[in-house]
Amino acid sequence: MKKKKIGLLVMAYGTPDSLDEVEAYYTHIRHGRKPSEEALQDLIGRYKAIGGISPLAKITKEQAHKLTDSMNNMFTEYEFNCYLGLKHTAPFIEDAVEEMKRDGIEQAISIVLAPHYSTFSIKAYNERAIRLSEEIGGPVIEPIDQWYDEPKFISYWADQIKETFTKIEDNEKAVVIFSAHSLPEKIIAAGDPYVEQLQYTADLIAAAANIQNYTIGWQSAGNTSDSWIGPDVQDLTRDLFEEHRYESFIYCPVGFVAEHLEVLYDNDYECKVVTDELNAAYFRPTMPNAQSTFIDCLATIVSRKMKEIVDKELILNNN
């Protein structure tokens, strides 16, 4: 019996593959407006500081393909085909949807490699994909909107924190800062659940790791005229030190799923500069990347959506 093909659309932010691509990438982020030479060189300098280019592109591809392999192992009666769609670099989200159409994919599941829902991220990704699929007559895309409370995601970070605390002598003088990418404050006024979801993720992880000293912060805010969600993790670090005299800071950027510029520079460089100034210890647990435990987490999320689709089809076929 021929297996039914299912498209697995894995979406992520994207990153330049080389320093030569940084300007085009930055221009795309700015909706077609080229950055100033000063802003461009600042961004290039950040990439150089982490070794020349971000590992994100390689990690994202590995995550997508390993997830697809896991799905094929879990659902042997179906054939999952991997399609990678990126927000700001090729292959763009639209490229992936068009490729699915050319390949004859009639049904697809989409997942964004970001756990927390916001109109700026997950909603925007899925809308781009679904809008084009409707325009070109398929495939039908079943989106996964959020997975910030997935137990295996919570367990991953709780385990990382527990391991980190084994390296700290005085746990009562340590604090965990859970962070995500800052977004414009106007999303809060519009009822976006992004902030509440990060707090809930932090509460779940803290409970699972049995830690008392923790808070949430925001990082990597854009350089625009908008007000962005705060406090920024660097300011937060200084405030926490002044108030509690913490000796160890553990940064958990749970809004991200891989090592990339925002983690390797904004956390590992900029936050460490602050902890060094305060003569405090800096810790940042290992990111999920393409570790088997995290791939299993993603597969659990996608398989739940797949079972919903299968159950829906059974109901329709029995009517």
Curated annotation (Swiss-Prot):
Localization annotation: Cytoplasm
What reaction does this catalyse? Fe-coproporphyrin III + 2 H(+) = coproporphyrin III + Fe(2+)
Recorded hits in Gene3D superfamilies, A to Z, give: 3.40.50.1400
Biological-process GO terms, alphabetical: heme biosynthetic process
Top enzyme class, one word, equals lyase
- Catalytic activity, EC: 4.99.1.9
Q: Does the keyword Cell cycle apply?
A: no
| Metabolic or biological pathway | Porphyrin-containing compound metabolism; protoheme biosynthesis
GO CC annotation terms, alphabetical: cytoplasm
Q: Which residues bind Fe(2+)?
A: 181, 262
Single annotated GO MF:
ferrochelatase activity
Q: What does this protein do?
A: Involved in coproporphyrin-dependent heme b biosynthesis. Catalyzes the insertion of ferrous iron into coproporphyrin III to form Fe-coproporphyrin III.
Its family remark reads: Belongs to the ferrochelatase family.
Per its UniProt record, what PANTHER family does this chain match? FERROCHELATASE (PTHR11108), FERROCHELATASE, MITOCHONDRIAL (PTHR11108:SF1)
Its name, as the record gives it, is Coproporphyrin III ferrochelatase 2
